[in-house]
Amino acid sequence: MASSAGHNPGLCDWVMSKTRVAQFKLGQVVRHRRFAFRGVIFDIDPEFNNTEEWYQSIPAEVRPRKDQPFYHLFAENAETEYIAYVSEQNLLLDTSGEPVRHPQVAEVFERDAAGGYRPRVSLLH
């Protein structure tokens, strides 16, 4: 019979509960649940990694949890393009198939035959 010496199921459960897998991936087009903007994901933080000042500037009633993935987006709304930092709980997959017009998208990504975005090979080296 194998020994379970050194095995701490409580610790393992705690570590697993703290390990998050991002729901979205680089190059995916997502939209915000509440606000009218969308964008291409260009970076992912496994949990909140911005300033406390930025976090506190969000109204308390809509402030997201810090213990979840946060996504950097090349974002756009009806008026302009910008960089957004959004919690996973506030994102949905954008299924419109429309290209994102943010000017930096073409610097980092190329479109594939299906209309998705994949990182440019030159950036992977």
Listing of model-derived features with the role each one plays in the protein:
Residues 2-29, 34-38, 45-48, 120-125:
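Mixed-charge, Lys/Arg-rich low-complexity intrinsically disordered regions
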Residues 28, 57-62:
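Intrinsically disordered, low-complexity boundary segments flanking structured domains
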Residues 42-43, 52:
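Short, glycine/acidic-enriched capping/hinge loops at junctions between secondary-structure elements
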Residues 43-45, 75:
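Residue-level signal for short segments within beta-strands and strand-turn junctions
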Residues 48-57:
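Short, solvent-exposed secondary-structure boundary/capping segments
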Residues 63-125:
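Intrinsically disordered, low-complexity, charged/polar segments
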